[in-house]
């Protein structure tokens, strides 16, 4: 996990809006980026639906929301359509961003 007041690692990933998302384009804005393991699983679906329900509150604060997982863009599009998700999901197939943010790797208990 990235620590507070530390520059966020670069993000450049394909998005469900058919563009490439670049974190640097959001400089000066509030941004929530949440990571999740897999589309359409119980915990990940619950988390995504919670962000979706709260999206109007985040928008009032000029805050963007993005979800990132290792799922394909096709999987993200189906997931987004099924649950009527109103924000973009980003696909990190090679897990480079997930690893930069230290949210992917062997579990340590």
Range-by-range predicted roles:
Residues 1-109:
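Chalcogenol-based redox active-site neighborhoods
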């Amino acid at each position: 996990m990235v620590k507070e007041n530390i520059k966020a690692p670069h993000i450049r990933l394909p998005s469900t809006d058919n563009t490439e998302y670049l974190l640097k384009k959001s400089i000066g804005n509030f941004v929530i980026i949440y990571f999740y393991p897999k589309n359409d699983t119980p915990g990940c679906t619950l988390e995504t639906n919670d962000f979706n329900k709260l999206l109007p509150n985040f928008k009032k604060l000029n805050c963007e929301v993005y979800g990132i997982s290792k799922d394909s863009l096709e999987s993200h599009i189906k997931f987004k359509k099924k649950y009527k998700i109103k924000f973009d999901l980003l696909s990190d197939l090679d897990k480079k961003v997930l690893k930069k943010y230290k949210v992917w790797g062997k579990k340590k208990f």
